[in-house]
UniProtKB/Swiss-Prot annotation:
Region (Disordered): 1-91, 108-168
Protein name: Putative insulin-like growth factor 2 antisense gene protein
Gene: IGF2-AS
Biased composition (Basic residues): 59-70, 159-168
Domain of life: Eukaryota
Naturally occurring in which organism (per UniProt): Homo sapiens
Length: 168
């Protein structure tokens, strides 16, 4: 709806600007290609400028204090609160999540092969679940579970990550 509104508004301004140039009629004459063509070309950038300004104000409204948005738009207020309050945490969280995912993606390449060997190897099953060979994958699974849980842990993931990666 905002697009239509701005296009109509710009069209009205261009109609005012056109009469000294070519035609006093508000609608373009079919035989005059230039006024019709210019009117079609010009509102597009003008509409984009208006939309840019509108999106900026919308972004500022969302980023700004929730008090303004709470009275104007309830939905925008909720979105703005979640974005603005969680932005600081989410950036750090996403960095940690990316690091954990990189670790998780590199390490499972080893794990499925180990698990596959245990499943394909009949010896552990013949010995029973309490035998020694199945225990190492359980230890690896615990590490994998830590990898999966730490990004969700909030503060804990940073503490866990620093000793694991002393270089970074």
């Amino acid at each position: 709806m905002s697009k239509r509104k701005w296009r109509g508004f710009r069209g009205a301004q261009q109609e005012r600007a056109q009469p000294p140039a070519a035609s006093p009629q508000p609608c373009p004459a079919p035989h005059a290609g230039l006024p019709g063509g210019s009117r079609r070309r010009a509102p597009a950038p003008a509409g984009q400028q208006q939309m840019r300004a509108e999106s900026r104000s919308g972004a500022q409204r969302r980023r700004g204090s929730a008090r303004r948005g709470a009275h104007r738009e309830a939905g925008g207020c909720v979105r703005g609160r979640t974005r603005s309050s969680g932005s600081e945490r989410s950036n750090a969280l996403w960095q940690a999540v990316d690091a954990a995912e990189a670790l998780a993606l590199s390490s499972p390449l080893r794990r499925p092969w180990d698990q596959a060997q245990h499943f394909t190897n009949p010896a552990p099953f013949s010995k029973g679940p309490q035998s020694a060979p199945p225990s190492p994958p359980a230890g690896r699974r615990r590490r994998g579970a830590d990898l999966a849980l730490t990004p969700l842990a909030g503060e804990g993931h940073t503490r866990w990550r620093q000793p694991g990666r002393p270089g970074k």
